[in-house]
Amino acid sequence: MTYRPTIFRVERETVGTMENEIAPIVERELRASPDSIEQIEEGLLHETYEISCDGEEYVLQLSSEGDEGEADALRRGLNCYVMLQDTEVPVPAIVTEEIRAFDRGWYSLVEKLPGKTGKLDISPRKVRNAARYLAKIHDVRSFETSGWVRFEDREPSIRPFQDGSLRRWILRTVEETSTTLGGGGIESAGSALERVFEREGAALPDEFAPVFCHNDFTPDNVLFENEEVVGILDFDRAHASHAQRDLVKAANGFWMHDPGAEWDVQTTFYEGYREVGELDGSFASNEPLYRVETLAWTVAGLLELDELSAYEKEFYTEKLLAAIDRIEDVSP
């Protein structure tokens, strides 16, 4: 009940045009020809390749020419890796310290980390360990305002949300999400979402200390070896935000990779986070709102990609309505 990733192996004799484009990049950066090129298709924002060269492995990401949003995301992700090099957060070592131009856009090159992503293989231990590292990410940097992370001379700066605050940004996206749910065959959940945030949206926190947030912390972006975290990937969507929201969104993301688990994925994630990070008393009232908002946003994204079957639509309708009922249960 989540993205269905596929990986296409590109052999040297069939690489053709792709090799003609990528090999020169590799030769320029590594001063050697690639031994193999493997294209990765996992719903990634960028065109991504795993490169083997002289016994070492690398990851090359490309953004399309003319797509400034994609180039900004590539730049943000690479700069986040640079910022995190000397922290407890395990990120890839950098080959290109800034994104570089090629014939049809921009690229970045980093060393490939060991381990495998969680994907559809999560466990209580993996979930706890991942949550601990999310707490470490939140401890990297604090900011004076919330918004999108940008970099100027390697230093992070913030472009405030266009709506003026995280709360107003959430309320606007909830309106868009409810419309998407309704148009995608999840009408009852879309209508209930709109109603509950019209009534309870003012309770969303507007006063908090913004911290560095991954904003896409899912099993797809966490590497494990023997259930231990050995790498964290893809900071392209990083922003300065409320740690509690990033935590809840991440817990939803891990739950969605095994929604039929007989153990409580979200609670386990929160417990792991608390082993490293702090959650004050406001979490009990904020969590139900953030859970509904971030879950609905993710489901809407899957609908837009036509990724949900009729059964999955019914399943997520039930889960969204149950999550909305939790808001009503905790509301004064």
What does each model-found stretch correspond to?
Residues 7-11, 298-332:
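ATP/Mg2+ or Mg2+-diphosphate-binding catalytic cores
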Residues 15-33, 142-215, 328-331:
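An alpha-helical support segment within catalytic cores of ATP-dependent transferases
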Residues 26-35, 86-90, 277:
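Short secondary-structure junctions
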Residues 40-167, 182-190:
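ATP-binding pocket architecture of kinase catalytic cores
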Residues 44-52, 60, 197-245:
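Active-site acidic catalytic loop and adjacent metal/ATP-binding pocket
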Residues 109-120, 172-176, 295-311:
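A glycine-centered beta->alpha junction motif in the catalytic cores
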Residues 245-278, 291-308:
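Active-site activation/catalytic loop segments of kinase-like enzymes and analogous catalytic loops
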Residues 282-290:
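Alpha-helical scaffolds flanking conserved acidic
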